[in-house]
Amino acid sequence: MGKVYDWFEERLEIQAIADDITSKYVPPHVNIFYCIGGIVFTSFLIQVASGFAMTFYYRPTVAEAFSSVEYIMTDVNFGWLIRSIHRWSASMMVLMLILHMFRVYLTGGFKKPRELTWVTGVILAVLTVSFGVTGYSLPWDQIGYWAVKIVTGVPEAIPVVGGSIVELLRGGVSVGQSTLTRFYSLHTFVLPLLTAVFMLMHFLMIRKQGISGPL
């Protein structure tokens, strides 16, 4: 193992990278509440892993979506556990996100020069809520169907462009297969990609600027 490590060390300077990561100064006022953001990130990773596992069995069609979820829960080995973990970690992510934003706001972490860190955090909050809205519809049961119908109907109140936005979200005039396909694509590809990008930006800015001082 030593020779393998030395081979990589000679080419990538792994030790220098590790030293830079572990030697970052942590202010003495930092407490457990400053770790809440890390819990949000951990919940996101659990979401990605458990969601990826379910894509092997889930079928995003109005005829088979509900039965495929039933199959995951009853026939797939540990499928019930994987889906439950996905649901529990989703709730944990939302709860910890709210607490994290409260902590940042109450400790003034949004002030100069960290305004952009706050902005990326707000964008991540919007993406998290979008995860909830799109994921809620995927079982395509009565609750999911009517939730989608109500949510996608909200923009209709916007003058001039409201109807066009509704059709864009639904993939047509009414809720159906095109709507489910759109929500599935958003939930499994678009939103995870955007979340990963903005999380990286968020972390890099925190790394660059450090943790905000006490009030």
UniProtKB/Swiss-Prot annotation:
Residue numbers binding heme b 1: 100, 202
One Gene Ontology cellular component annotation held by this UniProt entry: chloroplast thylakoid membrane
Keywords: Chloroplast, Electron transport, Heme, Iron, Membrane, Metal-binding, Photosynthesis, Plastid, Thylakoid, Transmembrane, Transmembrane helix, Transport
Keyword Membrane found: yes
Transmembrane segments: 32-52, 90-110, 116-136, 186-206
UniProt keyword Cytoplasm, yes or no: no
Lipid bilayer topology: Multi-pass membrane protein
GO MF assignments: electron transporter, transferring electrons within cytochrome b6/f complex of photosystem II activity; metal ion binding; oxidoreductase activity
Subunit structure: The 4 large subunits of the cytochrome b6-f complex are cytochrome b6, subunit IV (17 kDa polypeptide, PetD), cytochrome f and the Rieske protein, while the 4 small subunits are PetG, PetL, PetM and PetN. The complex functions as a dimer.
Role, per record: Component of the cytochrome b6-f complex, which mediates electron transfer between photosystem II (PSII) and photosystem I (PSI), cyclic electron flow around PSI, and state transitions.
PANTHER family: CYTOCHROME B (PTHR19271:SF16)
Additional observations: Heme 1 (or BH or b566) is high-potential and absorbs at about 566 nm, and heme 2 (or BL or b562) is low-potential and absorbs at about 562 nm.
Family: Belongs to the cytochrome b family. PetB subfamily.
The name this protein goes by in its record: Cytochrome b6
